[in-house]
Amino acid sequence: MRLPNAAHESRPWRIHELTHDFRLEDVWELPTPGGPHDFPRLVQEIASGNPSQGSSRVVGALFALRWKIGELLGWDGPDAGLGSRVPTLRDRLPVDLRHAPSGPNFDALPFTSLYLIDDEFAAEIANRTMHGVMHLGWVPDGTGGYHGQMAVYVKPNGLFGTAYMAAIRPFRHLIVYPPIMRQIGRTWRAGTPSASRLVAPT
């Protein structure tokens, strides 16, 4: 479910220290109910997932089209990414986050992990169109449980990047993300013990 940006901005996430010149594109509540210690599992499932294969045929086709266009136009080459076109956000990490675990490697998506702490994970991506950040947080639900929250930050690359992000926004919100959220929920439920829903100890 898509959330107002304030649902992310109102929380004291460490990512705010790194993204002052990025735009918060959107915020999503993830269908991943769990207990206080389940966040590492969520991070691992996101990093090991492949939305182009597990979500829907339409999403798979859109991902395939994007990668093909990127290949033809050179959007995703080595000179378009982190450390070449843009510096990595690891250069902005404060000392404590620099010494924290960076998080898992991604199996399918071209993200690079930035940091992983108890309730927060961030990874970045860069190409000819934009420099982006995916942020995952582990949010209490008010009843003793928790769930994941995902935020997407973007810094478009010039006028072309701004126009590109505006053009794909309706597809992301209406076609791409809803089936991805359902797939995340299915994967989460498949790995959750059916006997209980973990809650914080009282």
Placement of each model-derived feature along the sequence:
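Hydrophobic ligand-binding cavity/cleft-lining segments
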Residues: 1-100
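Intrinsically disordered, low-complexity coil segments
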Residues: 51-56, 99, 106-107, 141-143, ...
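Short C-terminal domain-edge/linker segments immediately following a structured domain
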Residues: 59-62, 152-156, 178-186
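Hydrophobic-ligand binding "helix-grip"
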Residues: 98-142
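Short terminal or interdomain "cap/linker" segment that borders an active site or interface and mediates
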Residues: 120-122, 130-133, 142-143, 147, ...
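Beta-strand/loop substructures that line and gate deep hydrophobic ligand-binding cavities in soluble
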Residues: 127-166
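A conserved amphipathic terminal alpha-helix motif
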Residues: 164-195
